[in-house]
């Protein structure tokens, strides 16, 4: 299996990386637009021109339709789509979840994906809906694991995506991830989350993703199946997801819905397009409303992809800038349930400590959610472990940062500072990270801050 995943930068649990499979490269985080080979809303060549280096298509649909199957077997899936970039294929698991059955076995669909040259192919896992009885989830999970083992032992298979299932049971998600981590895979998707995303159950999404992520190997990307909305992507990247796929750009367009990082807007309610992408600058909402349905769908789908690309690019830059947590916070505030997911991530920030860089640039803090940032949790824990109770020191309260100005008046090892965000900080660490670069909301009266600082000096 010719697969390599290189991590170039990181923030929170998010990673800026590069996945290389069979000579094709994909920069991560990445979104793979879903291409329906039977009736593509946008031609894959157009998708490539919009800046996407990879797509995902359905091998089950290709195999089921004779004309698609024959062309794919003759020209490969890249030739069928007319797309020379990274192509991942799904196995029919979505159809299995929707209709309860598919007309293909796991071995047949895995071998077929190899024959058509998929860069990454998916096993026929069994998605279990949220809140299903535990006995059913355990049964479906065992089937998924059996099929994963079967796939990796075949003499003919593509680089594989082994999907983590387990419904809304965190322990079963962890168990599935542990078992799959023992098998060679190119990608480890987290499946069965589409119903949660559709119902805006962001708290449950955070729980199942963290449960899966905790047991997956760090040298392979994690794909959050079915996550393709701007509102969800920064939060998912902060949890450690690297790949996403979206049919929503086309589904929303067909029902006259317009994607925004702040949510989904209805075309009929738009006075102007709050976007400067080519699709939006060439038209106004009145023009688009008067178009024939097919052309209107194309324009909206094009905008939706531009919006998704913008979110992906913004998220990549946030990783490099060390601002991924701030981005996730700001985006999630657009919807109460997305914000509930952010609160849950902050509550469980300790689970992200092992992935988050211990040192970065400035740290912005705003409220109780900010206290859950993994780098601040790590700092507080290290203070407790290395300095204990700091007995015998004068603990100064109510002093504005930077504390180093106070330290100049007394020996630093005589002092400690009670800090709302960091705990009790030894004086000698006043100029260390993150104490010296923590940015918090300022008081209404800056003069009062200065007065308290002067009082601290006198004390």
UniProtKB/Swiss-Prot annotation:
Q: Which UniProt keywords apply?
A: Glycosyltransferase, Metal-binding, Transferase, tRNA processing, Zinc
The gene for this chain is tgtA
Gene Ontology cellular component terms for the protein in this record: cytoplasm
Q: In which pathway does it act?
A: tRNA modification; archaeosine-tRNA biosynthesis
* EC number, as in UniProt: 2.4.2.48
Q: Where does substrate bind?
A: 125, 192
Q: Where does Zn(2+) bind?
A: 275, 277, 280
| UniProt remark on cofactor binding | Binds 1 zinc ion per subunit.
The lineage is: Archaea, Methanobacteriati, Methanobacteriota, Methanomada group, Methanopyri
Q: Do the record's keywords include Transferase?
A: yes
Q: Which domain of life is it from?
A: Archaea
GO MF: pentosyltransferase activity; zinc ion binding
Query: What function does this protein fulfil?
Result: Exchanges the guanine residue with 7-cyano-7-deazaguanine (preQ0) at position 15 in the dihydrouridine loop (D-loop) of archaeal tRNAs.
**Similarity comment: family membership:** Belongs to the archaeosine tRNA-ribosyltransferase family.
What InterPro entries would the database entry show? Answer: ArchSynthase1/Queuine_TRR, TGT-like_sf, TgtA, tRNA_ribo_trans-like
Q: Per its record, how is this protein called by name?
A: tRNA-guanine(15) transglycosylase
Q: Which reaction does it catalyse?
A: guanosine(15) in tRNA + 7-cyano-7-deazaguanine = 7-cyano-7-carbaguanosine(15) in tRNA + guanine
Any one Pfam family here would be: TGT
Cofactor names: Zn(2+)
Active-site residues per Swiss-Prot or TrEMBL entry: 90 (nucleophile)
User: Could you state one GO biological process linked to this protein?
Assistant: tRNA wobble guanine modification
């Amino acid at each position: 299996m010719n697969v390599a995943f290189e991590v170039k930068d990181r923030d929170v649990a998010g990673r800026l990386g590069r996945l290389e499979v069979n000579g094709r490269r994909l920069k991560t985080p990445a979104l793979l637009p879903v291409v329906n080979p039977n009736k593509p809303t946008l031609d894959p060549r157009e998708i490539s021109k919009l800046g996407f280096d990879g797509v995902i298509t359905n091998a089950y649909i290709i195999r089921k339709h004779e004309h698609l199957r024959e062309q794919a077997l003759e020209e490969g899936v890249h030739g069928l789509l007319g797309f020379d970039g990274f192509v991942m294929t799904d196995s029919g698991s979505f159809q299995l979840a929707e209709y309860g059955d598919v007309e293909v076995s796991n071995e047949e669909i895995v071998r077929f994906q190899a024959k058509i040259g998929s860069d990454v192919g998916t096993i026929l896992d069994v998605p279990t809906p949220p809140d299903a009885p535990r006995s059913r989830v355990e049964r479906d999970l065992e089937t998924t694991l059996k099929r994963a083992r079967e796939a990796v032992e075949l003499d003919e298979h593509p680089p594989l995506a082994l999907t983590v299932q387990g419904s809304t049971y965190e322990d079963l998600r962890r168990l599935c991830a542990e078992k799959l981590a023992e098998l060679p895979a190119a990608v480890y998707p987290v499946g069965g989350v589409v119903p949660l995303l559709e119902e805006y159950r962001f708290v449950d999404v955070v729980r199942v993703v963290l449960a899966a992520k905790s047991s997956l190997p760090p040298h392979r990307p994690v794909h959050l199946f079915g996550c393709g909305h701007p509102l969800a992507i920064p939060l998912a990247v902060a949890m450690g997801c690297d790949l996403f796929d979206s049919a929503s750009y086309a589904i929303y367009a067909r029902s006259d819905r317009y994607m925004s990082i702040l949510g989904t807007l209805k075309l009929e309610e738009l006075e102007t397009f709050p976007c400067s992408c080519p699709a939006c600058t060439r038209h106004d909402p009145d023009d688009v409303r008067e178009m024939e349905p097919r052309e209107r769908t194309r324009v909206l789908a094009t905008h939706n992809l531009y919006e998704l690309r913008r979110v992906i690019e913004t998220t990549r830059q946030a990783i490099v800038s060390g601002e991924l947590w701030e981005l996730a916070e700001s985006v999630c505030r657009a919807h109460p349930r997305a914000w509930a997911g952010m609160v849950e991530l902050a509550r469980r920030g300790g689970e992200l400590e092992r992935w988050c860089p211990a040192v970065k640039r400035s740290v912005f803090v705003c409220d109780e959610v900010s206290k859950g940032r993994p780098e601040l949790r790590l700092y507080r824990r290290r203070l407790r472990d290395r300095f204990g109770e700091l007995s015998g020191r004068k603990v100064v309260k109510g002093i504005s940062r930077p504390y180093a100005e106070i330290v100049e008046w007394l020996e630093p090892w005589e002092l400690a500072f009670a800090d709302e965000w960091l705990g009790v900080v030894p004086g000698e660490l006043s100029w260390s990270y993150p104490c010296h670069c923590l940015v918090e909301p300022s008081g209404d009266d800056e003069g009062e801050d200065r007065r308290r600082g002067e009082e601290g000096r006198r004390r």
